[in-house]
Amino acid sequence: MKTLLLTLVLVTIMCLDLGYTIRCFITPDVTSTDCPNGHVCYTKTWCDGFCSSRGRRVELGCAATCPTVKPGVDIQCCSTDNCNPFPTRP
C-alpha cells in the first residue's frame, strides 16, 4: 500500500506544471537570472559613436516577447536556459 501511495505521489509531482522559469543572462552585470514563465532571452547589439574603438554595444535580458528594434540594431532571441551569453569579439 505504501508503495502504491509513493508511486501516485511521484507521478503527480512529475505531471504538475511547476511554473518553469527560464534563466537568462542580464546586463550590466552579465549574471544568470530567473525570468518569468513564458519569457524569452535576448541579445541586442548596436553601434554607437565609439563602435570603431570599443566594438558594438551589448544588452542582454529577458522579455515576454522578442523586442522590436530600430534599424541598425540587431537582436537575437532564444528560449533555453542561459542561451544568451555575452558575445565574443571576432
Curated annotation (Swiss-Prot):
The lineage of its organism: Eukaryota, Metazoa, Chordata, Craniata, Vertebrata. It comes from the Eukaryota. Keywords: Acetylcholine receptor inhibiting toxin, Disulfide bond, Ion channel impairing toxin, Neurotoxin, Postsynaptic neurotoxin, Secreted, Signal, Toxin. It is found in: Secreted. GO terms for cellular component: extracellular region. Belongs to the three-finger toxin family. Long-chain subfamily. Type II alpha-neurotoxin sub-subfamily. GO terms for molecular function: acetylcholine receptor inhibitor activity; ion channel regulator activity; toxin activity. This is Long neurotoxin 7. It comes from Naja sputatrix. Disulfide bonds join C24-C41, C35-C62, C47-C51, C66-C77, C78-C83. InterPro entries: Snake_3FTx (IPR003571), Snake_toxin-like_sf (IPR045860), Snake_toxin_con_site (IPR018354), Toxin_cobra-type (IPR054131). SUPFAM superfamilies: Snake toxin-like. Binds with high affinity to muscular (alpha-1/CHRNA1) and neuronal (alpha-7/CHRNA7) nicotinic acetylcholine receptor (nAChR) and inhibits acetylcholine from binding to the receptor, thereby impairing neuromuscular and neuronal transmission.
